[in-house]
A protein has these predicted regions:
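Core subunits and conserved enzymes of cellular information-processing
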Residues: 1-220
């Protein structure tokens, strides 16, 4: 059963990465965390998946330092999943979708919504299985446990920081701005927040959320 959960968790982790790739490919802006990733990747000429993995590594390392109940096995599994996560984003963005250009704005909207839904469902399944965690959400959980502020408070702070940094870099270096209408759309599509996903699922999980309800609460 444990091995099956690990395999399924990896699968849905990668499905989430596929969804994120679609939102980026749509070209109408991305969620807060991904806005920073794409902006930084554009400025440094690195691949988006590589940047996403590197930043998640940084959060995971911080979690390791904060987590008093850390288990090497759990962190190694997340580490491997993050590598696959970045690889899938790079594969879809630069190989499978690399030559695709969408001119029709309605098509872009549909593609973005589809990607957001896929990413959210993948994330919800990962959290429901309870094997893998997403570094940013884990970081916010660990911080909230040590302070009087809630998980949501810190998750919003991360979002605000990412958006502010993305805008600052774009304006300062005169590069494309990725905080656009897609960023707003993502907030209305998901109940709560996403990071290429996702804190809402942690909130429900922490309240003994029934996994069978995950689809019904995913949409507003």
């Amino acid at each position: 059963m444990w091995k099956k959960k690990i395999v399924l968790s990896f699968l849905f982790y990668l499905i989430s990465a596929l969804g994120i790739s679609l939102t980026i490919q749509a070209g109408i802006g991305v969620s807060s965390f991904n806005a920073f990733n794409v902006t930084f990747a554009t400025l440094t000429h690195l691949k988006v998946g590589t940047v996403t993995t590197a930043i998640n590594f940084a959060f995971l390392g911080t979690c390791w330092l904060l987590d008093q109940q850390r288990k090497i096995q759990d962190y190694l599994i997340i580490l491997v999943a993050l590598i696959g996560f970045g690889f899938v984003i790079n594969f879809f963005l630069y190989q499978l979708f690399g030559s695709l250009v969408f001119q029709n704005y309605l098509v872009k909207i549909v593609l973005f919504i589809l990607g957001t839904i896929i990413a959210g469902i993948g994330t919800g399944q990962v959290v429901a299985l309870g094997v893998l965690q997403f570094p940013i959400e884990k970081f916010c959980t660990l911080i909230s446990e040590r302070t009087r502020y809630s998980f949501q408070f810190y998750r919003y702070l991360v979002d605000i920081f990412c958006v502010s940094l993305a805008l600052g870099l774009s304006i300062g270096y005169h590069s494309p701005i990725f905080v656009r209408e897609g960023t707003v759309i993502s907030l209305f599509l998901l109940v709560g927040r996403e990071s290429g996903g996702n804190s809402v699922f942690y909130e429900y999980k922490s309240r003994n959320w029934n996994p069978n309800e995950r689809i019904s609460v995913f949409f507003k």
